[in-house]
Protein backbone atom coordinates (compact mmCIF):
# COMPACT_ATOMS: atom_id res chain seq x y z
CA UNK A 1 0.00 0.00 0.00
CA UNK A 2 1.22 3.50 -0.76
CA UNK A 3 2.51 5.44 2.22
CA UNK A 4 -0.03 8.13 1.58
CA UNK A 5 -2.72 5.57 2.28
CA UNK A 6 -1.51 5.09 5.85
CA UNK A 7 -0.62 8.58 6.93
CA UNK A 8 -3.04 11.24 8.12
CA UNK A 9 -1.48 14.66 8.64
CA UNK A 10 -2.37 15.99 12.09
CA UNK A 11 -0.81 19.44 11.58
CA UNK A 12 -3.67 21.89 11.03
CA UNK A 13 -3.60 23.64 7.68
CA UNK A 14 -0.59 21.70 6.44
CA UNK A 15 -2.44 20.04 3.55
CA UNK A 16 -3.77 23.40 2.34
CA UNK A 17 -0.21 24.74 2.31
CA UNK A 18 1.00 21.62 0.50
CA UNK A 19 -1.73 21.97 -2.13
CA UNK A 20 -0.77 25.58 -2.85
CA UNK A 21 2.97 24.83 -2.90
CA UNK A 22 2.54 21.97 -5.35
CA UNK A 23 0.33 23.84 -7.81
CA UNK A 24 1.84 27.33 -7.62
CA UNK A 25 4.92 26.51 -9.79
CA UNK A 26 2.53 25.55 -12.61
CA UNK A 27 0.46 28.75 -12.44
CA UNK A 28 2.30 30.53 -15.26
CA UNK A 29 2.17 27.49 -17.52
CA UNK A 30 -1.56 27.17 -16.77
CA UNK A 31 -2.05 30.30 -18.86
CA UNK A 32 0.70 29.76 -21.43
CA UNK A 33 -0.55 26.25 -22.20
CA UNK A 34 -3.94 27.74 -23.08
CA UNK A 35 -2.55 28.67 -26.51
CA UNK A 36 -3.87 25.45 -28.01
CA UNK A 37 -6.57 24.65 -30.55
CA UNK A 38 -8.50 22.46 -28.05
CA UNK A 39 -9.20 25.40 -25.71
CA UNK A 40 -11.76 27.19 -27.90
CA UNK A 41 -14.03 24.17 -28.49
CA UNK A 42 -13.69 23.32 -24.79
CA UNK A 43 -14.86 26.86 -23.88
CA UNK A 44 -17.90 26.64 -26.14
CA UNK A 45 -18.68 23.07 -25.14
CA UNK A 46 -18.61 23.78 -21.41
CA UNK A 47 -20.39 27.12 -21.77
CA UNK A 48 -23.41 25.48 -23.37
CA UNK A 49 -23.17 22.31 -21.27
CA UNK A 50 -23.23 24.51 -18.18
CA UNK A 51 -25.75 27.09 -19.38
CA UNK A 52 -28.51 24.81 -20.64
CA UNK A 53 -29.04 22.77 -17.44
CA UNK A 54 -28.80 25.95 -15.37
CA UNK A 55 -31.67 27.49 -17.33
CA UNK A 56 -33.73 24.41 -16.51
CA UNK A 57 -32.74 24.64 -12.82
CA UNK A 58 -33.61 28.35 -12.82
CA UNK A 59 -37.09 27.54 -14.11
CA UNK A 60 -37.48 24.86 -11.42
CA UNK A 61 -36.44 27.15 -8.54
CA UNK A 62 -38.46 30.06 -9.96
CA UNK A 63 -41.62 27.96 -9.76
CA UNK A 64 -40.94 26.41 -6.35
CA UNK A 65 -39.62 29.41 -4.40
CA UNK A 66 -42.33 31.90 -5.38
CA UNK A 67 -40.03 33.66 -7.89
CA UNK A 68 -37.21 34.06 -5.33
CA UNK A 69 -34.62 32.64 -7.73
CA UNK A 70 -34.45 33.13 -11.47
CA UNK A 71 -32.09 33.10 -14.42
CA UNK A 72 -29.85 35.96 -13.22
CA UNK A 73 -29.24 34.39 -9.80
CA UNK A 74 -28.26 31.08 -11.37
CA UNK A 75 -26.03 32.74 -13.97
CA UNK A 76 -24.29 34.86 -11.33
CA UNK A 77 -23.66 31.76 -9.22
CA UNK A 78 -22.07 30.10 -12.24
CA UNK A 79 -19.89 33.16 -12.86
CA UNK A 80 -18.78 33.22 -9.22
CA UNK A 81 -17.75 29.56 -9.27
CA UNK A 82 -16.14 29.65 -12.71
CA UNK A 83 -14.04 32.78 -12.25
CA UNK A 84 -12.89 32.05 -8.68
CA UNK A 85 -11.93 28.45 -9.40
CA UNK A 86 -10.32 29.29 -12.74
CA UNK A 87 -8.11 31.92 -11.11
CA UNK A 88 -7.35 30.39 -7.71
CA UNK A 89 -8.09 26.66 -7.52
CA UNK A 90 -5.62 23.81 -7.55
CA UNK A 91 -7.72 21.94 -10.12
CA UNK A 92 -9.11 24.45 -12.66
CA UNK A 93 -10.43 21.61 -14.83
CA UNK A 94 -13.24 21.04 -12.31
CA UNK A 95 -16.28 23.02 -13.47
CA UNK A 96 -18.22 24.73 -10.68
CA UNK A 97 -21.81 25.89 -11.01
CA UNK A 98 -25.41 25.25 -9.96
CA UNK A 99 -26.40 21.59 -9.63
CA UNK A 100 -29.67 19.68 -9.42
CA UNK A 101 -29.17 18.70 -5.74
CA UNK A 102 -28.65 22.32 -4.63
CA UNK A 103 -31.93 23.31 -6.30
CA UNK A 104 -33.69 20.58 -4.30
CA UNK A 105 -31.97 21.87 -1.16
CA UNK A 106 -32.92 25.51 -1.81
CA UNK A 107 -36.61 24.99 -2.48
CA UNK A 108 -36.92 22.51 0.40
CA UNK A 109 -35.50 25.15 2.77
CA UNK A 110 -38.04 27.57 1.30
CA UNK A 111 -40.92 25.14 1.96
CA UNK A 112 -39.82 24.58 5.57
CA UNK A 113 -39.12 28.20 6.53
CA UNK A 114 -41.96 29.82 4.58
CA UNK A 115 -44.52 28.17 6.86
CA UNK A 116 -42.72 29.61 9.91
CA UNK A 117 -42.71 33.13 8.52
CA UNK A 118 -38.89 33.23 8.58
CA UNK A 119 -37.36 35.61 5.98
CA UNK A 120 -35.99 33.29 3.32
CA UNK A 121 -32.89 35.06 2.01
CA UNK A 122 -31.44 36.08 5.42
CA UNK A 123 -31.98 32.52 6.68
CA UNK A 124 -30.39 31.04 3.55
CA UNK A 125 -27.51 33.46 3.97
CA UNK A 126 -26.86 32.18 7.49
CA UNK A 127 -26.96 28.61 6.20
CA UNK A 128 -24.23 29.53 3.71
CA UNK A 129 -22.18 31.45 6.29
CA UNK A 130 -22.27 28.56 8.78
CA UNK A 131 -21.45 26.16 5.95
CA UNK A 132 -18.49 28.35 5.02
CA UNK A 133 -17.17 27.98 8.57
CA UNK A 134 -17.62 24.19 8.42
CA UNK A 135 -15.80 24.11 5.06
CA UNK A 136 -12.91 26.00 6.66
CA UNK A 137 -12.81 23.64 9.65
CA UNK A 138 -12.79 20.53 7.46
CA UNK A 139 -10.12 21.90 5.12
CA UNK A 140 -7.87 23.23 7.90
CA UNK A 141 -8.22 19.96 9.86
CA UNK A 142 -7.16 18.06 6.70
CA UNK A 143 -10.58 16.38 6.65
CA UNK A 144 -10.74 16.08 2.87
CA UNK A 145 -8.26 13.22 3.38
CA UNK A 146 -11.28 10.94 3.77
CA UNK A 147 -12.23 11.49 0.12
CA UNK A 148 -10.01 8.42 -0.35
CA UNK A 149 -12.92 6.27 0.84
CA UNK A 150 -15.18 7.39 -2.02
CA UNK A 151 -15.62 4.56 -4.51
CA UNK A 152 -17.67 3.89 -7.63
CA UNK A 153 -20.32 2.29 -5.41
CA UNK A 154 -21.54 5.61 -3.98
CA UNK A 155 -20.62 7.67 -7.07
CA UNK A 156 -22.82 5.56 -9.32
CA UNK A 157 -25.71 5.69 -6.84
CA UNK A 158 -25.46 9.48 -6.69
CA UNK A 159 -25.19 9.69 -10.48
CA UNK A 160 -28.34 7.59 -10.93
CA UNK A 161 -30.14 9.72 -8.33
CA UNK A 162 -29.28 12.92 -10.21
CA UNK A 163 -30.38 11.32 -13.50
CA UNK A 164 -33.83 10.46 -12.12
CA UNK A 165 -34.13 13.94 -10.61
CA UNK A 166 -33.65 15.27 -14.16
CA UNK A 167 -36.40 13.00 -15.49
CA UNK A 168 -38.73 14.03 -12.67
CA UNK A 169 -38.09 17.73 -13.29
CA UNK A 170 -38.97 17.29 -16.96
CA UNK A 171 -42.29 15.71 -16.04
CA UNK A 172 -43.01 18.45 -13.49
CA UNK A 173 -42.38 21.19 -16.06
CA UNK A 174 -44.89 19.57 -18.44
CA UNK A 175 -47.45 19.06 -15.66
CA UNK A 176 -47.23 22.79 -14.95
CA UNK A 177 -48.38 23.44 -18.52
CA UNK A 178 -51.85 22.10 -17.65
CA UNK A 179 -52.77 25.49 -16.22
CA UNK A 180 -52.44 26.94 -19.73
CA UNK A 181 -54.96 24.51 -21.24
CA UNK A 182 -55.00 21.08 -22.87
CA UNK A 183 -53.93 22.34 -26.31
CA UNK A 184 -50.87 24.00 -24.82
CA UNK A 185 -50.08 20.88 -22.79
CA UNK A 186 -50.41 18.54 -25.79
CA UNK A 187 -48.10 20.67 -27.94
CA UNK A 188 -45.62 20.99 -25.05
CA UNK A 189 -45.47 17.21 -24.58
CA UNK A 190 -45.05 16.71 -28.34
CA UNK A 191 -42.17 19.19 -28.57
CA UNK A 192 -40.50 17.75 -25.45
CA UNK A 193 -40.64 14.21 -26.89
CA UNK A 194 -39.33 15.38 -30.27
CA UNK A 195 -36.51 17.22 -28.52
CA UNK A 196 -35.68 14.06 -26.57
CA UNK A 197 -35.52 11.99 -29.77
CA UNK A 198 -33.36 14.49 -31.67
CA UNK A 199 -31.06 15.14 -28.70
CA UNK A 200 -30.70 11.41 -28.09
CA UNK A 201 -30.01 10.83 -31.81
CA UNK A 202 -27.23 13.44 -31.82
CA UNK A 203 -25.61 11.78 -28.81
CA UNK A 204 -25.98 8.25 -30.24
CA UNK A 205 -24.65 9.12 -33.70
CA UNK A 206 -21.82 11.13 -32.14
CA UNK A 207 -20.67 8.04 -30.25
CA UNK A 208 -21.12 5.66 -33.19
CA UNK A 209 -18.94 4.88 -36.22
CA UNK A 210 -21.24 6.75 -38.63
CA UNK A 211 -19.83 9.65 -40.68
CA UNK A 212 -16.36 11.09 -40.23
CA UNK A 213 -14.71 11.74 -36.88
CA UNK A 214 -15.12 15.52 -37.25
CA UNK A 215 -18.86 15.19 -37.94
CA UNK A 216 -19.32 12.96 -34.89
CA UNK A 217 -17.47 15.42 -32.64
CA UNK A 218 -19.57 18.28 -34.07
CA UNK A 219 -22.77 16.41 -33.17
CA UNK A 220 -21.55 15.66 -29.65
CA UNK A 221 -20.37 19.21 -28.99
CA UNK A 222 -23.12 21.27 -30.60
CA UNK A 223 -26.03 18.93 -31.38
CA UNK A 224 -27.91 19.82 -28.20
CA UNK A 225 -27.43 23.56 -28.73
CA UNK A 226 -28.68 23.30 -32.31
CA UNK A 227 -31.68 21.29 -31.08
CA UNK A 228 -32.64 24.02 -28.59
CA UNK A 229 -32.39 26.69 -31.28
CA UNK A 230 -34.46 24.63 -33.73
CA UNK A 231 -37.22 23.66 -31.31
CA UNK A 232 -37.44 27.17 -29.89
CA UNK A 233 -38.54 28.22 -33.38
CA UNK A 234 -40.41 24.98 -34.16
CA UNK A 235 -43.58 26.26 -32.47
CA UNK A 236 -43.87 29.02 -35.10
CA UNK A 237 -44.37 26.55 -37.97
CA UNK A 238 -47.88 26.31 -39.44
CA UNK A 239 -50.87 26.39 -37.10
CA UNK A 240 -48.65 25.76 -34.07
CA UNK A 241 -48.00 29.50 -34.00
CA UNK A 242 -51.60 29.94 -32.82
CA UNK A 243 -50.68 28.22 -29.53
CA UNK A 244 -48.90 30.48 -27.06
CA UNK A 245 -46.39 28.32 -25.21
CA UNK A 246 -45.07 29.32 -21.79
CA UNK A 247 -41.52 30.71 -22.05
CA UNK A 248 -38.52 30.80 -19.74
CA UNK A 249 -39.11 33.71 -17.31
CA UNK A 250 -36.33 36.32 -17.26
CA UNK A 251 -35.80 39.72 -15.65
CA UNK A 252 -33.80 42.89 -16.33
CA UNK A 253 -30.09 42.70 -17.06
CA UNK A 254 -27.86 42.20 -14.00
CA UNK A 255 -30.79 42.58 -11.60
CA UNK A 256 -32.25 40.06 -9.12
CA UNK A 257 -35.53 38.37 -10.02
CA UNK A 258 -37.29 39.93 -7.04
CA UNK A 259 -37.18 43.65 -6.34
CA UNK A 260 -34.29 43.53 -3.87
CA UNK A 261 -30.62 44.39 -3.49
CA UNK A 262 -27.83 41.97 -4.39
CA UNK A 263 -26.61 42.39 -0.80
CA UNK A 264 -28.64 40.37 1.72
CA UNK A 265 -29.23 42.06 5.09
CA UNK A 266 -28.50 38.88 7.01
CA UNK A 267 -28.62 40.61 10.40
CA UNK A 268 -32.36 41.27 10.03
CA UNK A 269 -33.41 37.90 11.40
CA UNK A 270 -34.21 36.62 14.92
CA UNK A 271 -31.19 35.27 16.83
CA UNK A 272 -32.92 31.92 17.25
CA UNK A 273 -33.14 31.51 13.48
CA UNK A 274 -29.42 32.23 13.17
CA UNK A 275 -28.68 29.10 15.21
CA UNK A 276 -31.54 27.19 13.61
CA UNK A 277 -29.60 27.50 10.37
CA UNK A 278 -26.76 25.35 11.76
CA UNK A 279 -28.30 21.89 11.10
CA UNK A 280 -29.25 23.01 7.59
CA UNK A 281 -25.68 24.18 7.03
CA UNK A 282 -24.33 20.81 8.18
CA UNK A 283 -26.49 19.08 5.57
CA UNK A 284 -25.28 21.55 2.91
CA UNK A 285 -21.66 20.92 3.91
CA UNK A 286 -22.18 17.16 3.65
CA UNK A 287 -23.69 17.60 0.19
CA UNK A 288 -20.80 19.74 -1.02
CA UNK A 289 -18.18 17.49 0.58
CA UNK A 290 -19.44 14.59 -1.50
CA UNK A 291 -20.65 16.38 -4.63
CA UNK A 292 -17.68 18.69 -5.16
CA UNK A 293 -14.98 16.17 -4.33
CA UNK A 294 -16.58 13.52 -6.54
CA UNK A 295 -16.69 16.10 -9.37
CA UNK A 296 -13.01 16.82 -8.83
CA UNK A 297 -12.20 13.10 -8.74
CA UNK A 298 -14.09 12.52 -12.00
CA UNK A 299 -12.30 15.45 -13.67
CA UNK A 300 -9.05 13.65 -12.78
CA UNK A 301 -10.19 10.18 -13.83
CA UNK A 302 -7.27 7.77 -14.45
CA UNK A 303 -8.30 7.59 -18.12
CA UNK A 304 -7.10 11.20 -18.47
CA UNK A 305 -3.27 11.41 -18.57
CA UNK A 306 -2.95 14.48 -16.33
CA UNK A 307 0.52 15.64 -15.33
CA UNK A 308 -0.11 18.65 -13.07
CA UNK A 309 -0.96 18.16 -9.37
CA UNK A 310 -4.36 18.98 -7.89
CA UNK A 311 -5.28 19.95 -4.33
CA UNK A 312 -8.44 18.80 -2.59
CA UNK A 313 -8.00 20.69 0.69
CA UNK A 314 -7.31 24.12 -0.81
CA UNK A 315 -10.16 23.73 -3.29
CA UNK A 316 -12.58 22.78 -0.51
CA UNK A 317 -11.44 25.84 1.47
CA UNK A 318 -12.05 27.94 -1.65
CA UNK A 319 -15.49 26.36 -2.03
CA UNK A 320 -16.26 27.57 1.50
CA UNK A 321 -15.49 31.13 0.43
CA UNK A 322 -17.77 30.97 -2.63
CA UNK A 323 -20.51 29.40 -0.47
CA UNK A 324 -20.36 32.29 2.01
CA UNK A 325 -20.28 34.91 -0.75
CA UNK A 326 -23.25 33.31 -2.51
CA UNK A 327 -25.26 33.54 0.71
CA UNK A 328 -24.50 37.25 1.03
CA UNK A 329 -25.47 37.83 -2.62
CA UNK A 330 -28.66 35.77 -2.34
CA UNK A 331 -27.76 33.31 -5.10
CA UNK A 332 -27.59 29.49 -5.16
CA UNK A 333 -24.28 28.22 -3.78
CA UNK A 334 -22.18 26.77 -6.63
CA UNK A 335 -20.18 23.57 -6.37
CA UNK A 336 -18.60 20.94 -8.61
CA UNK A 337 -20.68 19.74 -11.55
CA UNK A 338 -20.51 15.98 -11.96
CA UNK A 339 -21.41 15.71 -15.66
CA UNK A 340 -19.59 18.87 -16.77
CA UNK A 341 -16.30 18.36 -14.86
CA UNK A 342 -15.22 15.19 -16.72
CA UNK A 343 -16.75 16.60 -19.93
CA UNK A 344 -14.42 19.59 -19.62
CA UNK A 345 -11.35 17.40 -19.24
CA UNK A 346 -12.51 15.20 -22.12
CA UNK A 347 -12.98 18.27 -24.35
CA UNK A 348 -9.36 19.24 -23.68
CA UNK A 349 -7.98 15.84 -24.67
CA UNK A 350 -5.66 15.67 -27.67
CA UNK A 351 -6.59 12.40 -29.37
CA UNK A 352 -5.54 10.23 -32.23
CA UNK A 353 -7.50 7.47 -33.96
CA UNK A 354 -5.84 4.06 -34.20
CA UNK A 355 -7.21 1.65 -36.81
CA UNK A 356 -7.01 -2.09 -36.37
CA UNK A 357 -7.51 -4.15 -39.52
CA UNK A 358 -8.05 -7.88 -39.56
CA UNK A 359 -9.41 -10.33 -42.08
CA UNK A 360 -12.99 -9.91 -40.94
CA UNK A 361 -13.53 -6.23 -40.18
CA UNK A 362 -11.82 -2.90 -39.64
CA UNK A 363 -12.15 -1.29 -36.21
CA UNK A 364 -11.02 2.04 -34.82
CA UNK A 365 -10.10 3.22 -31.35
CA UNK A 366 -9.59 6.73 -30.02
CA UNK A 367 -6.44 7.12 -27.93
CA UNK A 368 -5.77 10.12 -25.67
CA UNK A 369 -2.24 11.46 -26.16
CA UNK A 370 -2.45 14.21 -23.55
CA UNK A 371 -4.72 16.76 -21.88
CA UNK A 372 -4.34 20.53 -22.32
CA UNK A 373 -4.23 21.45 -18.61
CA UNK A 374 -4.87 25.19 -18.27
CA UNK A 375 -7.13 27.78 -16.62
CA UNK A 376 -8.30 29.85 -19.57
CA UNK A 377 -11.22 27.69 -20.76
CA UNK A 378 -12.95 27.77 -17.36
CA UNK A 379 -12.28 31.50 -17.01
CA UNK A 380 -13.48 32.38 -20.52
CA UNK A 381 -16.72 30.40 -20.18
CA UNK A 382 -17.31 32.29 -16.92
CA UNK A 383 -16.93 35.61 -18.77
CA UNK A 384 -19.28 34.33 -21.48
CA UNK A 385 -21.83 33.64 -18.76
CA UNK A 386 -21.50 37.26 -17.59
CA UNK A 387 -22.34 38.30 -21.14
CA UNK A 388 -25.43 36.10 -20.98
CA UNK A 389 -26.79 38.34 -18.21
CA UNK A 390 -26.99 41.31 -20.61
CA UNK A 391 -30.35 42.52 -21.90
CA UNK A 392 -30.15 41.26 -25.52
CA UNK A 393 -29.13 37.74 -24.53
CA UNK A 394 -31.72 37.56 -21.75
CA UNK A 395 -34.29 38.48 -24.40
CA UNK A 396 -33.04 35.57 -26.51
CA UNK A 397 -33.26 33.19 -23.53
CA UNK A 398 -36.82 34.37 -22.92
CA UNK A 399 -37.77 32.91 -26.32
CA UNK A 400 -37.03 29.35 -25.14
CA UNK A 401 -40.30 27.51 -24.43
CA UNK A 402 -40.51 25.73 -21.09
CA UNK A 403 -41.31 22.45 -22.87
CA UNK A 404 -37.91 22.58 -24.59
CA UNK A 405 -36.29 22.75 -21.16
CA UNK A 406 -38.40 19.74 -20.14
CA UNK A 407 -37.00 17.87 -23.14
CA UNK A 408 -33.51 19.00 -22.12
CA UNK A 409 -34.06 17.53 -18.65
CA UNK A 410 -35.03 14.23 -20.27
CA UNK A 411 -32.00 14.15 -22.57
CA UNK A 412 -29.67 14.77 -19.64
CA UNK A 413 -31.49 12.20 -17.53
CA UNK A 414 -31.55 9.35 -20.06
CA UNK A 415 -27.95 10.04 -21.12
CA UNK A 416 -26.85 9.82 -17.49
CA UNK A 417 -28.87 6.64 -16.89
CA UNK A 418 -27.45 4.73 -19.85
CA UNK A 419 -23.93 5.91 -19.05
CA UNK A 420 -24.23 4.84 -15.41
CA UNK A 421 -22.37 1.79 -14.12
CA UNK A 422 -25.49 0.43 -12.41
CA UNK A 423 -27.34 0.37 -15.74
CA UNK A 424 -24.39 -1.32 -17.43
CA UNK A 425 -24.36 -4.00 -14.74
CA UNK A 426 -28.08 -4.64 -15.19
CA UNK A 427 -27.65 -4.89 -18.97
CA UNK A 428 -24.83 -7.42 -18.49
CA UNK A 429 -26.92 -9.50 -16.09
CA UNK A 430 -29.88 -9.62 -18.47
CA UNK A 431 -27.82 -10.25 -21.61
CA UNK A 432 -27.52 -13.57 -23.40
CA UNK A 433 -24.22 -15.11 -22.31
CA UNK A 434 -23.66 -16.37 -25.86
CA UNK A 435 -23.30 -12.85 -27.26
CA UNK A 436 -21.45 -11.23 -24.34
CA UNK A 437 -17.73 -10.79 -24.96
CA UNK A 438 -15.61 -13.29 -23.07
CA UNK A 439 -13.29 -10.43 -22.14
CA UNK A 440 -16.04 -8.46 -20.37
CA UNK A 441 -14.81 -7.28 -16.97
CA UNK A 442 -17.75 -8.72 -15.04
CA UNK A 443 -17.02 -12.21 -16.40
CA UNK A 444 -14.02 -12.29 -14.07
CA UNK A 445 -16.20 -12.15 -10.94
CA UNK A 446 -16.45 -15.35 -8.92
CA UNK A 447 -20.14 -15.75 -9.82
CA UNK A 448 -23.05 -13.95 -11.44
CA UNK A 449 -24.77 -13.91 -8.06
CA UNK A 450 -22.07 -11.54 -6.77
CA UNK A 451 -22.90 -9.00 -9.49
CA UNK A 452 -26.61 -9.33 -8.70
CA UNK A 453 -26.06 -8.73 -4.98
CA UNK A 454 -23.75 -5.76 -5.57
CA UNK A 455 -26.18 -4.15 -8.03
CA UNK A 456 -29.19 -4.76 -5.79
CA UNK A 457 -27.40 -3.01 -2.91
CA UNK A 458 -26.75 -0.05 -5.22
CA UNK A 459 -30.40 0.04 -6.28
CA UNK A 460 -31.49 -0.03 -2.62
CA UNK A 461 -29.17 2.91 -1.91
CA UNK A 462 -30.56 4.77 -4.91
CA UNK A 463 -34.14 3.96 -3.90
CA UNK A 464 -33.62 5.28 -0.37
CA UNK A 465 -32.04 8.50 -1.66
CA UNK A 466 -34.71 9.11 -4.28
CA UNK A 467 -37.55 8.17 -1.92
CA UNK A 468 -36.60 10.71 0.74
CA UNK A 469 -36.53 13.39 -1.96
CA UNK A 470 -40.20 12.69 -2.66
CA UNK A 471 -41.19 13.45 0.95
CA UNK A 472 -42.00 17.13 1.45
CA UNK A 473 -39.63 18.88 3.84
CA UNK A 474 -37.81 15.61 4.61
CA UNK A 475 -36.11 15.74 1.21
CA UNK A 476 -33.46 18.03 2.66
CA UNK A 477 -31.92 14.96 4.31
CA UNK A 478 -30.89 13.20 1.08
CA UNK A 479 -27.18 14.18 1.42
CA UNK A 480 -27.04 12.29 4.73
CA UNK A 481 -28.05 9.05 3.01
CA UNK A 482 -25.40 9.64 0.34
CA UNK A 483 -22.78 10.16 3.06
CA UNK A 484 -23.83 6.99 4.93
CA UNK A 485 -23.17 4.96 1.79
CA UNK A 486 -19.42 5.58 2.18
CA UNK A 487 -18.94 3.87 5.59
CA UNK A 488 -21.41 1.17 4.51
CA UNK A 489 -19.17 0.37 1.54
CA UNK A 490 -15.96 0.65 3.59
CA UNK A 491 -16.91 -1.43 6.62
CA UNK A 492 -19.92 -3.63 5.75
CA UNK A 493 -19.47 -4.78 2.18
CA UNK A 494 -16.01 -6.38 2.65
CA UNK A 495 -17.75 -8.84 5.00
CA UNK A 496 -20.10 -9.97 2.21
CA UNK A 497 -17.83 -9.90 -0.84
CA UNK A 498 -14.44 -11.33 -1.73
CA UNK A 499 -11.75 -8.68 -2.09
CA UNK A 500 -11.11 -9.84 -5.66
CA UNK A 501 -14.77 -9.29 -6.58
CA UNK A 502 -14.84 -5.80 -5.06
CA UNK A 503 -11.72 -4.85 -7.02
CA UNK A 504 -13.57 -5.77 -10.21
CA UNK A 505 -16.95 -4.28 -9.31
CA UNK A 506 -15.94 -1.19 -7.35
CA UNK A 507 -12.90 0.85 -8.28
CA UNK A 508 -11.63 3.14 -5.51
CA UNK A 509 -11.68 6.33 -7.57
CA UNK A 510 -11.08 8.52 -4.52
CA UNK A 511 -7.75 7.01 -3.55
CA UNK A 512 -6.53 6.98 -7.17
CA UNK A 513 -7.15 10.72 -7.50
CA UNK A 514 -5.84 11.49 -4.01
CA UNK A 515 -2.55 9.71 -4.67
CA UNK A 516 -1.87 12.18 -7.47
CA UNK A 517 -1.94 15.08 -5.02
Swiss-Prot record:
It is found in: Vacuole membrane. The chain crosses the membrane at residues 68-88, 93-113, 121-141, 155-175, 186-206, 217-237, 269-289, 311-331, 377-397, 403-423, 449-471. Pfam families: HCO3_cotransp. GO terms for molecular function: active borate transmembrane transporter activity; borate efflux transmembrane transporter activity; solute:inorganic anion antiporter activity. Keywords: Membrane, Transmembrane, Transmembrane helix, Vacuole. It is a multi-pass membrane protein. GO terms for biological process: borate export across plasma membrane; borate transport; monoatomic anion transport; monoatomic ion homeostasis; transmembrane transport. It comes from the Eukaryota. GO terms for cellular component: fungal-type vacuole; plasma membrane; vacuolar membrane. Belongs to the anion exchanger (TC 2.A.31) family. PANTHER family: ANION EXCHANGE PROTEIN, BORON TRANSPORTER 1. This is Putative transporter C543.05c.
Amino acid sequence: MNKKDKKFNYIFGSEIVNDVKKRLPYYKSDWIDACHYRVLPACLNIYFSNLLPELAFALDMFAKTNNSFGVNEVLLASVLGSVVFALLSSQPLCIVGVTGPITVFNYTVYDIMHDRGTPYFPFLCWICLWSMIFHFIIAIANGVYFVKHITKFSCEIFGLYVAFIYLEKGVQVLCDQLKYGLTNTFLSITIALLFLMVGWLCDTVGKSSLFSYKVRILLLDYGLVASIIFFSGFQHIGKMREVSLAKLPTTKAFEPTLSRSWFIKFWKIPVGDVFLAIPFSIVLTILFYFDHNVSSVMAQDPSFPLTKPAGFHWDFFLLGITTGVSGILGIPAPNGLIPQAPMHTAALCVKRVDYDEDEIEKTHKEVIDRVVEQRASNFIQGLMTVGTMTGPLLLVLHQIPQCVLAGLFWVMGFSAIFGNGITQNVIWMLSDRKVVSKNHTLNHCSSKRVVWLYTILQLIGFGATFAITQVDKASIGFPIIILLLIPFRTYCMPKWFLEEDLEILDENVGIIAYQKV
